[in-house]
Amino acid sequence: MKKKLLSALLSVAMVSALLVGCGDTATEPAADAAATTDAAADTAATDEAAPADDAAAATGSWDVTDGGKVLNIYCWNEEFKSRLTDHYPGYTEVDGTHGTIGDVQVVWNITPSDDNAYQNNLDETLLAQADAAADDKIDLFLVEADYALKYVDTEYTVPVSALGLTDADVADQYQYTKDVVTDANGQLKGVSWQGCPGVLVYNRAAATEVLGADDHDTVQAAVKDWDTFLATAATMSDAGYKMTATTNDAFRVFSNNVTTKWVENGAINIDANIKAWVDMSKTMVDAGQTGTADLWSDDWSKGFYPEGKVFCYFGPAWLVDFCMAADDTASIAAQGGWGATEGPQGFYWGGTWICGANGTDNAAEVCDIMKQLTTNTDIMKEIVVADNDFVNNKPAMDAMAADETYGDAVLGGMNPLPMYCAGVEKIDLSNLTNYDQGCNESFQLAMKEYFEGNATYEEALDLFYTGVTEKYPELTY
């Protein structure tokens, strides 16, 4: 069983730092470790099906009890810790890595995602979970959408129902957030306090200078579809602005609107919308309308400042409020200089899910954390007001979207929640696969060679195929 679980945990290894992240306040980039990839390939080649395909996974052998004295939480940054510290009733902070809930000690194990360190640490600890001392067992851990199924489709995560959470408890959560962490047997294996629908975030000063006004309707008319977006990029370029900081800014918008999967019947598939991103990006790079820097690089974030001369970014609430340097008085965000509009297409980006670990002896505490931080409407509203997060609770978001007193300082006091609420209902995960993270990252990495003129499209495509099949040797193309 351990070997089969190892295969499941290692089969979705990563290759680069293109995932969401911004220091200590939002999800951080994750990258592949070569040794992990090699281990996955070796194990997958010699082992039978992962537990998700086993009868045992369907029925579940859930080792969840109460009475534990230490609650171990594994995560990759401070975001969830701050939510628990600030909003969970009865939590007392002791120091940076310890707290208490009643007579239960809370221990935070925070490992940054850089170079896949978080997942590597989590995998190693989960593999030893059955033999670990009670006070050392993982009780609760976090996952992101791009690799959630890696953990959800194993017996290391327990259904939330086994912890005590009911269908009625999660009835007001957005469906896509439940789809992300539903296993192959239809069991809900996690919950999230946030939703991550995205918008186009634009530089108000640039809009006023180039488009004549910075209001929502004026800007939306200039970016209403990709043809119009491209035409506006030329106008912005003539005025000295890049339309986006990098080609990768728009990638999530295109990849979230595909009509086919990355892998179809075991073969790698390039969706027409992914190819459309390539074509638009190449046009913009050649025209000097965007750059080729990696997300989270210094060149990418230069546009957070007026002298960076970037018109727009694409992102959800966490990008706007936690990643655009709002704490730096010289930034556009600190001056309330950004606006928001729907852009050419709706999309989502990121999100963090809370999973209960099989073997926890703090089931009641794990369940109550899930219940309070993801289903309590009053606490959800508190999070919106205090943290400008988009929360995973329909009544809370509908109320806040209609609240004329609410505004986001980064967006000049604008209330973007009606846009987020409209966008979240359109999120479609029907084309999600276990291979998405690796394919998304490898494709962007390979196409950078094409955009920069170091390879033809066909040569870059070969680089992509080589990289993906090294990670997933079972795939063809």
How would you describe each model-predicted region?
Residues 23-149, 365, 445, 455-459, ...:
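Conserved N-terminal structural module of periplasmic/extracytoplasmic solute-binding proteins
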